[in-house]
Amino acid sequence: VDYCKIKCSSGIHTVCQYGESTKPSKNCADKVIKSVGPTEEEKKLIVNEHNRFRQKVAQGLETRGNPGPQPAASDMNNLVWNDELAHIAQVWASQCQILVHDKCRNTAKYQVGQNIAYAGGSKLPDVVSLIKLWENEVKDFNYNKGITKQNFGKVGHYTQMIWAKTKEIGCGSLKYMKNNMQHHYLICNYGPAGNYLGQLPYTKK
């Protein structure tokens, strides 16, 4: 794929700009990188946790919200892992621009959304605990308002996670030591993208 030819609303494609290598960049010099990329086991956990939560919401079992509960969904897809999405996410994760979104990450197939999470502690936070940070944003979500400029910063990770039309996910990660703490950094890319302003994340059942 010639990523330099892929169009986005702004910016140069991440893989065009940084190349295909997923080796941590010199920007990572202040960190002791322990591992690059999710393990096979973590890939399964990422997909399973997303689908568990998507089904919970789809079945109308998510009681949290502003107001809760969240309505059931009639059109929720199950997500599958996509290696291309994961590779693009990993190239970006390996730039060590912690908690910054890249500008252009689309594939030839579709526009691509993104969630980022990060946590540190005396022991390594596991991948599911990072995903739950996104799920917990449901507490601030009012389904009837959908995605607005006002609520996007508070609920955008949740809404991308449960965006019904999204079908594929691929994630990159870094595990590293800094200041005697173990850090886990996760970037998930989603296709087709969710989080269109003025839209609802799924069709109410």
Swiss-Prot record:
PANTHER family noted in UniProt: CYSTEINE-RICH SECRETORY PROTEIN-RELATED
Pfam family for this entry, one: CAP
PROSITE patterns: CRISP_1, CRISP_2
Disulphides: 4-16, 8-104, 28-96, 171-188
Gene3D superfamilies: CAP (3.40.33.10)
Annotated keywords: Allergen, Disulfide bond, Secreted
Main subcellular location: secreted
Species, as recorded: Polistes fuscatus (Paper wasp)
Family membership: Belongs to the CRISP family. Venom allergen 5-like subfamily.
Name the record gives this protein: Venom allergen 5
Domain SCP residue range list: 47-190
Cellular component per GO, a single term: extracellular region
Keyword Disulfide bond attributed: yes
